[in-house]
Structure formats: C-alpha cells, structure tokens
Amino acid sequence: MKRLLLLAASFFLLMGMSAQERRADGAGYERKVVVEELTGTACGWCPRGLVGMKMLRDLYGDRFIGVAVHQFNATDPMYTPDYADIDWSDGGLKGAPCCMIDRNGEIIDPFYGSAGGMRDVAKDFERAMEEKAVLGVTVSGEWNADYTAVQTTAQVEGTEAGRYEMVFVLVADSVAGNTQRWRQLNNYCGYTRDSFDDDLLAPFLQGGSYGQQGDYCKYIFEDVLVGSSYKYKGTQYSNCLLYTSDAADD
C-alpha cells in the first residue's frame, strides 16, 4: 500500500474567490487563483493538461492552486467520485483535458487556454490574478497520529460583505505507482515536433522521455485531488476533517 503524500491543504471560496493572503505591504490581499482540471490516466490527450498545470505552477508559484480532478475514467487509481458537480462537458462541447479557473463558469483547455494558442492558458490565469481580492484566508492543517486524516482550520477576513461558500480541498503531490493502472495513456507518443513544436510537450512526443515508453508512460502526478468537504455537503461545521485514502500499487 502506498500512502499519498500531503503537500498542501488547499482552501478556496466559490463565486470566483480563491484563497488570499494579506500582502506584506499592507495593501489588501494578494490574489491566488484556483485551477480545477479534469484529467485521467485513460485520457490520451491529458498529458497536455499535465504540462499546462506544471507550467502554471512553475510560473506563478504559490499563487497557483491546482486541483487535478481524476474523474475521466473510474479505472484510474486516483479516481475521486465525491467532488463538485461541475459540467466539464460544457453542454457536450468539451472533453478532457479541460479546466476551469476560479469557478468562472468557462471550461477551457489547460494548455491552449481560451485563445487556443500554445501555452495560452497562462494568459487566462494572469487575467484572473488581476481581479481584486476581497477576502483574506489563512489555512492550517494537522495530521492525526497514523496519517489517515487531517484536521483543517481556516480564518477568513474580508473587505466586502457577501455570502460565500467555503470548500476545503486536500491535494497530494508526487503520487505514483508501479503497475499498469498507474500509467498515463499518451497519444502524443506517435507525433514529432513537426506537429507539436513546443519544449514543454516535447517529452511526450516521439523519442521524448515519456514518448519513447510507448502508448502508456510512467508518470509522477501532482496536484491530485485526494478529498474535499463536498463529502460532507449540507453539514455545518467550524472545522473540516478530510480523510486520505491508501492507494494500492496494483
């Protein structure tokens, strides 16, 4: 059994308000942006989403809050059925990989973004960062003795009155397994840079470190949704207890 590694207990608010911290200069809050991505190990084009999410993390650091929702295929060992009711299909027009930024209602590509160009999702992210942050959030988390649950607490302060819904999300990094179930389908392995000329996609292309492994490649997954307070939907609470799950290597 492999224990998932908790690296972040991400907290965000719906209505487009993501987790913020007061700026060091005292001028309001520094906006952080949530990107929820639909993905799955049986999604052959999802390496594009893996690349896009990593790019956002590398570019924007802790201002990026990534939530990789593995709901494309139930055979995915990271599959999580209990999450928000998001219409990822956008009325049947979209498929995986796709993402939504700060619950703005727009389903876009996690690499091409809304504009459709290489790496253009960064432009969508930057527009979201420019929006005013009206709430400040401080989150803390503590594991129990055997690392099967984490107690989370949030402190919220704001500059504007309003009704907000709070959601706790537990994500994990460096998630991997040794069996076939953990391998990522990679449709890019048969293509060269003549088709996809981008350094970030290159490892998944023909001859790349992942592409040379064939149709399925071994990958270490980041920002993986492990649990959320949606499991307790309708329950009032001051603290939220989120449970992890042990993931089998098979």
Regions found by a protein language model. Give the residues of each.
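A short, hydrophobic C-terminal helix/tail in secreted or cell-surface proteins
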Residues: 246-250
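Short, conserved sequence motifs used for protein processing/export or organelle targeting and
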Residues: 68-245
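Intrinsically disordered, low-complexity boundary segments flanking structured domains
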Residues: 20-22, 52-58, 122-127
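Local sequence-structure signature of Cys/Sec-based thiol-disulfide redox active-site neighborhoods
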Residues: 26-62
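N-terminal "domain-start" segment that seeds a small globular fold
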Residues: 20-29, 133-137
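A generic structural signal for short, solvent-exposed coil/turn residues
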Residues: 11, 27, 35, 58, ...
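Bacterial Sec-dependent N-terminal signal peptides
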Residues: 1-24
